[in-house]
Amino acid sequence: MPTGTIILIVSIVIILIIAYVACLIVRKRNDNLLVALEERKEELFNLPVNEEVETVKALHLIGQSQVSFREWNQKWVDLSLNSFADIENHIFEAEGYNNAFRFVSAKNAIDSIDSQIDLIEEDIASIRQGLMELKEQEEKNSGRVKHALNLFDSLQEAVRENPDSYGETLSELEKQLKNIEVEFSEFVMLNSSGDPIEASEILDKTEEHMIALNQIMDRIPSLIERVTKDFPEQLEDLESGYRKLVEQNYLFTEANIESQFQNIRVSIRENTALIVSFDLDAAEAENEGIQAKIDHLYKVFNREIEANKEAVKISKNLPKFLEHVVQNTQLLDEESQRLNATYLLADSKLSRINQLKARLESIEIVVTESVEDIENPQVAYSILEERLDHSLASLKEIEEEQLVLADYLKSQELSENTARKKATLYINKLHTLKRYMEKRNLPGIPAEFLTNFFRTSDHVEALIAELDYKRINIEVVNRLLENATYDMNQLEELAYLIVQNATLTEQLLQYSNRYRSFDESVQKAFNRSLSIFEKDFDYQAAFEEISFALETVEPGVTERFVRSYEKTREAIRY
């Protein structure tokens, strides 16, 4: 055979072999896909949907719940009887295509089967979800029913065991419980007949009513206790206390006490009506208002009781204190009259003593009447206490002012005695200073000293003249004494200074002799200083002139002489 023919035959054989192998591979892959689809179908078919359907079916649902269950059940029946059978047929058909090497038909069949299984899987998931929701709704209703029953029983038990705690609201509470019982019966009927969806709506309303009623019942006992027990007891206590206080002659700043009692009773009745109508927020606010009215009356009564105690306490000592202050004022008046004959007393002080006398007269009237009113009061004790307190405070204030006035009167004679002694002393000092200056053997007395001496003498004489008046003005005396004292001190200091300057000048002039013979500046200073000393009598200028010259030739010499003089200075002896 020709070579070309052989090559062609070999090529055809090889192509056929390759095509056959490729077909085997594709068929194997399709077989695997079909096996996987068969397994998916079996997994879906083996899901416990039948058991779940039977479980929900056993709940005996009706109404809307039953309609939903029938829809899910019918859907499952269609799937289990028709859809799975169709898939089984399609798988068998696809296997035939695959075995016959009709791969395109097999591929289309496999894709169709896969889509069918996806749809069935979604349908089964929705069926199971729907069945689960029906079951959960039923179980939820059952749990809520139990809770609702327990709550309802607890409400009934609370009313049954503690009827007094609810007072006049009891009939309304029983009415509300009866309405809830009717609603609950309707719910139980629907739930028992297998309609949990509609029953759930009824249960929601019933639970809302029970929760609201439970909250109301929790608040009512405390409100009822206040209007039926607390307030009446407090009101009875107030009325009893009021009667006792009236029997003991108590009066009050408020004239409408009994009408306030009546207003509180009316408020209690009105608040009871609010509680019965379940307007509890308003009732609580009204309770606070009632308590405030009661507290106000307690405060009024306690204030009068405490005022009585305080008034009695003050009244025991106040008359004696008043008598003491009155006596002091009389003594001040007598003393002022006695002293006014000798001294010119300040009109303001005399006027103030008279004002105190008048003020004490009015206080005495108030105290006397108030003390008498304690046994048989004409006004409330709080008013009496206020009057007595004010009187006591006024008396203390007057007593303090009396001390000031007494010190003023006492100071008249003391000031006169002091001024007379000082005047006598200053006259003696003037004579002593005069002798002191004369004994210094000075060339002359400086004009400054003479001026101060005569001014001081005039002030002392003016002081003595003021003291010689028939009626002495102590204010003027004290002012003159102050001037004389100041002048006397100044004159004494001036005398010391003049004598010191004169003595030091003489000493320095003598000391300068050691320098005059050879130091012309010292000689000139000596001459000027001596001239000032003997002719002008300006001893300070003379001292400064010679000391300056000596300091030039012998620094520190002046300070040495000054220290020495201060150690041996002669004091003025009065």
From Swiss-Prot:
Q: What does this protein do?
A: Negative regulator of FtsZ ring formation; modulates the frequency and position of FtsZ ring formation. Inhibits FtsZ ring formation at polar sites. Interacts either with FtsZ or with one of its binding partners to promote depolymerization.
What keywords sit in the KW lines? Cell cycle, Cell division, Cell membrane, Coiled coil, Membrane, Septation, Transmembrane, Transmembrane helix
Residue ranges, Extracellular compartment?
1-7
Q: Name one GO biological process term.
A: division septum assembly
Keyword Cell membrane on this protein?
Answer: yes
Q: Which residues lie on this side of the membrane: Cytoplasmic?
A: 27-574
Which InterPro entries did the record assign?
Answer: EzrA
**GO CC entries:** plasma membrane; septin ring
**Name of the protein this chain belongs to:** Septation ring formation regulator EzrA
| Family, similarity comment | Belongs to the EzrA family.
State the compartments where it is located: Cell membrane
Membrane-spanning intervals of the chain: 8-26
Species annotation: Streptococcus suis (strain 05ZYH33)
The annotated topology with respect to the bilayer is: Single-pass membrane protein
**Coiled-coil segments:** 105-189
